[in-house]
A protein has these predicted regions:
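C-terminal-biased regions
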Residues: 1-79
């Protein structure tokens, strides 16, 4: 889970860059801090739904975040 928290600020910046003038960044950070992973996942999936708006490493970072969430969630379910 630590890796997810380390990557969250990077994802927040990507979201902020694509949603200027909104509270999207704050909402994403809030979701991560409070463990609202369904909300965080929905925001990232929304960004990935329009990949033509993403630049450089952004798409790969968003996908990496989703993969890490899936791994962490499956570990928590097994426990």
């Amino acid at each position: 889970m630590q890796v997810v928290y380390e990557l969250a600020p990077v994802i927040a910046e990507i979201i902020s860059a694509h949603c200027p003038g909104t509270r999207a960044r704050e909402e994403f950070v809030h979701a991560c801090i409070h463990g609202e992973w369904n909300d965080a996942t929905a925001m990232v999936e929304g960004m990935l739904a329009e990949p033509w708006h993403l630049r450089g490493y952004q798409e790969s970072r968003l996908r990496e975040f989703l993969e890490l969430l899936q791994v962490d969630q499956s570990v928590l379910v097994r426990q």
